[in-house]
Amino acid sequence: MSKYKFNIDNYHAIGHADIEIEGITVIVGSNGCGKSTMSRWLYYIVNTLSVLDSFFFSDFRDVIIKSLEKYSTALDDISNYLDDDKKRFFDHTLSLMTMVTLSNGGVEKLDFYYKRAIGSLDDMLVNFLQKEQNPQQVRRVLNLFGITEQNHVHEDIERNSIQLFSECLQKYENNKKNRPISYLKEKIASVYREKDGFPASISFKEDEVELLVDRLGKIYSLNNAIYIGTPAAISLRQSDRVLMTSLAHKVVHVNEKGSEITGKQELLHSINKMIDGSIVEKENFDAVDLVYHSNNGKDIRIEDIASGFKPLVYMLRLIENGWLTENTLLEIDEPETNLHPQWVV
């Protein structure tokens, strides 16, 4: 495992804080000194840096999709002249574009669907122009599509679409190359709904290499962070914090791309022994409840079990579902574990 150093100065309750992470790390301090704030920002940094290229691509993809969605109102307005199959084909193509990610086809697949959508628009527009008799309506639609003359439909649509895609692609390539720290700040604010502002003095090093510089460094040995908060603040059913909804998702759902960790069965056996039971799934109408089943036969919903049990239960599920691996930073913000020394990890 790589060695990490994380520092924040003069941010809310934090005056000066330095932590080194190499294996198990315990952060100790008085109540209100900023331990949770420190942990939260470490979570933000790791989870944003580790998928930065995916963020760049999703922003690129979303701009392309929005450029096509703006025509939907016009297509509805001129629906009397549209072939229903062509309109459905266009909508289906947009739906497929929303599912394109950096890892399942990237730019090449997005370009393919984009050209298909543009071709569909071209066909529908030509069909409309052949039948529409109102010159004002014709001009209105042509203006929306950026077409100068009615007899230049194919040329203008092709030129405009190529130009837009090229400009967006260039911006995407520039972001990948430059990796601006301003982008990291914007993503943390939007994705995690963080309203307190980015710390003025913050540092994150992997093996003594600073990653939070003007051109963001790439994180090598971690691919995600998981945050287990104070039990009283956690509800697997409802939460307004992204950290908690992310945890809830991982506790409930299997990671289809997850990998086995060394000693998985031994870990699971050890945790089951500590909690003197296991976690089972029980159907509850259209949902699934996670239930603690004790070795003496009692069933208790996870939400209702003792606070000291919860971190272990969540760890158990994270391991079972394939989310907790050797490349995961697990943060447990759990004061009550101090009441149970045998459960401290």
Which functions belong to the PLM regions below?
Residues 1-51, 291-345:
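Switch/communication elements of ASCE P-loop NTPase nucleotide-binding domains
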Residues 5-7, 48-327:
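Phosphate-coordinating catalytic segments in nucleotide- and nucleic-acid-processing enzymes
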